[in-house]
Amino acid sequence: MADPQATNGTGAACAERDASDVGDVSDVGDARDEGAGRVVAVRGAVVDVAFDGGALPALNEALTIPVDGAAPILAEVHAHLSDAAVRALALGPTGGLRRGAAVRATGGPIRVPVGDAVLGRLLSVTGAPGDDGAALAADVERRPIHRGAPPLAEQKSANALFATGIKVIDLLAPLAQGGKAAMFGGAGVGKTVLVMELIHAMVERYRGISVFAGIGERSREGHEMLLDMRGSGVLGRTVLVYGQMNEPPGARWRVPLTALAIAEYFRDERAQNVLLLMDNVFRFVQAGAEVSGLLGRLPSRVGYQPTLASEVAALQERIASVEGAAVTAIEAVYVPADDFTDPAVTAIAAHVDSMVVLSRAMAAEGMYPAIDPVASSSILLDPLVVGEAHVEVAIEVRRVIEHYRELQDVIALLGIDELGADDRRLVGRARRLQRFLTQPFAVTEAFTGQAGASVEIADTIAGCRAILRGDCDDWRESSLYMVGTLDDARRKEAAAREADARREAAAAASGAGPGTTSDPASGSAEPQGARHGR
């Protein structure tokens, strides 16, 4: 597929050429002689270059600009200004760059290292190592970051479930192996933790390759993720590609393409399943808006670039599966000001198979993962894909929780006792379902002290069906909170009842009468803010 810049005449997908590799910007010795130029203007990250030879570099071709006392600057051509000049976007800081500096065209787009050599490594947008490991070998295989999607005849549709072991996702918003899923949420609701748990699930369940693209996020978060992956043992089958928020917009804008090039290699050349994770796709759109402004284009709605739809489509359409190997994409999407009608959010949502919506209200109640069971959805929730039993339970769970939300205003004003018997019963089951759909994560075990739980889809369906049937109506709500299967909750309930019995026996023996215990229907250990009427 063509690069999104092709839609407005300022860029196009550059054809893959048999030219020198461009990943480590210091490796430019075989740049073509006729590609020599000079800098004629520098405006922040925008660099105008004149070429006296008359042969201009193609759009999206990489340029290298030596800088005295520093590493060469890598730039990418985005516009032809005249028959002898181009406008390029620097992918690194332009400090120290001056007019008249020599420029070399490399003869092709940016090329990044791929293969086993990059597993367990942290790379920049150009493929340069950013960790404390050894330098990559000079003969490592490289691929261009600009490529088209596989032909339609070679693409394979996503119709198999990607079981995550996360109850609320597998039940209500199942992911497709070889499909695209997006996790939408505002700041601080748990998107990154959810992405890390899915990396853990992929390594444990599928033994595949994970490629993580950190787009415009905090350097601290990137460092923490690197350390966490080392500690959990998943780094050896993962590639990290970072373009952090302190980097120029061009670097942040191209990071997803670098990650895609690596994922495509393992899909095409090794026939391996790949889990592609991107955090955060909104920052990709944001970087594109910055680039658009730097190149002088008029903004569109809410200040976004006029090419928003085509840029998002060009990225998403490259995420495709072929016969024998699947690329499963899971994307975290920041929702600015919790506004789900934002143009960037709606543009991304149009391309995904599963929408996992994280709720600030559920996070405030301590319901983690804070996934909204009503707003989340998936095209795979179909009897022909997941089966009749799965769909029936999912629909009923969603109906019960939605009806409970409709009753919350009445409960807040009049109290739960003013509801009819059927509504009180439904409220109790809805609250138990909400707590049963919480779950401890393996990646948070070091902080919570609670072992992570991965639950099979059949166990999730069986547990929800039992709650809907009323089998747990006399259980404490706290017994269902942060457990794996219903058997785990049953053991927790039995232990709580046994503890209550011991306390009552001790109180009776001391002559103080029966002890005051928590309401067995609600429990006393539920999360803060999870009482009736919130």
Curated annotation (Swiss-Prot):
CDD domains, per the entry: ATP-synt_F1_beta_C, F1-ATPase_beta_CD
Location in or out of the cell: Cell inner membrane
One Gene Ontology term of the molecular function aspect: ATP hydrolysis activity
Region (Disordered) location: 1-30, 494-534
Residue sites binding ATP per the record: G185, G186, A187, G188, V189, G190, K191, T192
Entry EC number(s): 7.1.2.2
Membrane protein topology class: Peripheral membrane protein
Keywords: ATP synthesis, ATP-binding, Cell inner membrane, Cell membrane, CF(1), Hydrogen ion transport, Ion transport, Membrane, Nucleotide-binding, Translocase, Transport
Pfam families: ATP-synt_ab, ATP-synt_ab_N, ATP-synt_VA_C
Source superkingdom: Bacteria
Compositional bias segments (type: Polar residues): 1-10
UniProt biased composition (Basic and acidic residues): 494-505
Cellular component, GO, one term: plasma membrane
Catalyzed reaction equations: ATP + H2O + 4 H(+)(in) = ADP + phosphate + 5 H(+)(out)
The protein's enzyme class: translocase
InterPro entries recorded: AAA+_ATPase, ATP-synt_VA_C, ATP_synth_F1_bsu, ATPase_a/bsu_AS, ATPase_alpha/beta_chains, ATPase_F1/V1/A1_a/bsu_N, ATPase_F1/V1/A1_a/bsu_N_sf, ATPase_F1/V1/A1_a/bsu_nucl-bd
Family membership noted in the UniProt record: Belongs to the ATPase alpha/beta chains family.
Subunit field text: F-type ATPases have 2 components, CF(1) - the catalytic core - and CF(0) - the membrane proton channel. CF(1) has five subunits: alpha(3), beta(3), gamma(1), delta(1), epsilon(1). CF(0) has three main subunits: a(1), b(2) and c(9-12). The alpha and beta chains form an alternating ring which encloses part of the gamma chain. CF(1) is attached to CF(0) by a central stalk formed by the gamma and epsilon chains, while a peripheral stalk is formed by the delta and b chains.
Physiological role: Produces ATP from ADP in the presence of a proton gradient across the membrane. The catalytic sites are hosted primarily by the beta subunits.
HAMAP family, sorted: ATP_synth_beta_bact (MF_01347)
Name the record gives this protein: ATP synthase subunit beta 2
Originating organism: Burkholderia pseudomallei (strain 668)
Gene: atpD2
